[in-house]
């Protein structure tokens, strides 16, 4: 399935067909058109996800995911960083925006003890996530809602203790609007934690396409300064961030120990740290 890529107005439009980008002269689509296209795209991915395979086969989703060691390590590193930056405590009510079929949401609930709500723009993703939660006995523990990050009409003001979002806001047409919505749905004093791909990471700049990983539509990369400014412009306070991960999710299991060592060294080495893959940022909702 080809993934369409549309860059912003006044810039080159590219449509990725398989792995070959083709220049087109089609007009820049509206934000709503991009989001509709994104919803359809993720509906397709959801139907082929590990969660869907688990529901179809009856196999334990943990056993399906267990073979993907690099991805599970990548996810846990992100979740632990979010927990640390957010100052979250077990049993708090968190919302994950861009939850897909729930791989992070389930782990945040079962492994880290949060009461979770998952939100995603893809109706098929939400359908599968709900079915999986029921099959795991988590139907009363996790709520899933369809929603748009830029609007979050499915969530009430101040309804959650904190918000997390992983690998999502990079595809949102208006990330500042999304952060303002994040501020709205989190209680005063709570924290919003969102990750962004680092513009200066070689993986995104040079290596991703060399390893056959398709360019995603609407994908954008950010500097730490841009991220900090967006959080401030959204009205979030006490902004702090960290840079982490040099390990791609496609890393073979045999190489994972070496990449974990690279993470350990790289994240602590001045200069090298600036090229880590992920900028994770946290901002506090002002107290009432």
Describe these PLM feature segments.
Residues 14, 18-88:
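Conserved class I S-adenosyl-L-methionine
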Residues 176-188:
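A short glycine-rich, Lys/Arg-flanked "PGG" loop and its adjoining helix->strand segment in the class I
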Residues 198-218:
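Short, glycine-/aromatic-enriched active-site segment of Class I SAM-dependent methyltransferases
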Residues 219-234:
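Short alpha-helix
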Residues 193, 207-210, 229, 239-288:
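A C-terminal cap/extension of S-adenosyl-L-methionine-dependent methyltransferases
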Residues 190-196:
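Conserved beta-strand signature within the Rossmann-like core of class I S-adenosyl-L-methionine
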Residues 103-151:
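Class I SAM-dependent methyltransferase SAM/SAH-binding core
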Residues 150, 154-162:
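A short acidic, Gly/Pro-enriched loop at the edge of an enzyme's catalytic core
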């Amino acid at each position: 399935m080809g993934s369409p890529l549309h860059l912003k107005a006044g810039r080159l439009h590219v449509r990725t067909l398989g792995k070959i980008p083709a220049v087109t002269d089609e007009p820049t689509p509206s934000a709503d058109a991009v989001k509709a296209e994104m919803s359809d795209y993720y509906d397709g991915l959801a139907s082929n996800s590990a969660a869907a395979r688990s529901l179809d086969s009856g196999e334990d989703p943990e056993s399906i995911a267990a073979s993907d060691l690099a991805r599970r390590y990548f996810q846990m590193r992100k979740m632990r960083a979010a927990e640390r930056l957010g100052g979250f405590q077990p049993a708090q009510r968190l919302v994950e925006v861009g939850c897909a079929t729930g791989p992070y949401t389930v782990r945040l609930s079962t492994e880290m003890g949060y009461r979770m709500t998952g939100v995603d723009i893809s109706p098929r993703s939400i359908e599968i996530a709900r079915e999986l939660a029921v099959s795991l006995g988590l139907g009363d523990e996790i709520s899933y809602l369809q929603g748009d990050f830029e609007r979050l009409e499915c969530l009430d003001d101040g309804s959650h203790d904190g918000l997390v979002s992983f690998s999502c806001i990079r595809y949102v047409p208006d990330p500042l609007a999304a952060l303002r919505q994040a501020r709205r749905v989190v209680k005063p004093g709570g924290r919003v934690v969102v990750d962004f791909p680092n513009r200066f990471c070689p993986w995104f700049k040079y290596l991703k396409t060399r390893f056959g990983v398709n360019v995603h539509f609407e994908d954008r990369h950010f500097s730490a300064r841009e991220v900090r400014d967006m959080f401030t412009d959204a009205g979030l306070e006490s902004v702090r961030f960290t840079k982490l991960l040099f390990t791609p999710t496609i890393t073979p299991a045999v190489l994972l120990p070496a990449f974990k060592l690279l993470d350990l060294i790289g994240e602590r080495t001045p200069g090298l740290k600036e090229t880590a893959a992920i900028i994770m940022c946290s901002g506090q909702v002002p107290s009432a």
